[in-house]
Design a protein with these regions (language model features):
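Short, structured surface patches at the beginning of a domain
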Residues: 1-123
């Protein structure tokens, strides 16, 4: 399953731009987004307290989660690292469209995740 995750911080913001960007990204990778999850929530809220937490618990090995920016997952590096770690451990692919990050089961992804982890430790 391929999921596009859209998060805005306030009701006044619209997720349409995020959805368009994810759709274009998916098409460029010859992927079809099967499901969209949209929520209005602060990125400072824990993923457990948002739809994202439910989504992460339901994803299975080889599923793909696409976000426009890593900050859509969380605003804190520690939370981002935890989310990325869960995805890597469970074999869930994670793509960010703007930064161009691709977290999958490759050695490059693991090295990048490790580097993010070091930064989180320093903070």
């Amino acid at each position: 399953m391929i999921i596009g995750y859209l998060r805005v911080s306030t009701e006044k913001q619209h997720p349409a731009n995020q959805q368009d960007e994810i759709r274009r990204f998916a098409e460029s990778k010859q992927l079809i987004v099967n499901h969209w999850v949209t929520e209005v929530a602060s990125g400072k809220k824990s993923e457990r307290d948002r739809k994202l937490g439910v989504l992460l618990r339901r994803l299975k090995r080889d599923d793909t989660l696409i976000v426009t920016e890593i900050s859509r997952l969380s605003r804190t590096l520690t939370d981002i690292m935890a989310i990325m770690g869960k995805c890597l451990e469970r074999g869930i692919n994670l793509y960010t469209t703007k930064e161009g990050y691709s977290f999958d089961n490759t050695i490059n992804s693991k090295v990048l995740c490790f580097a993010f982890g070091l930064v989180a430790e320093i903070e």
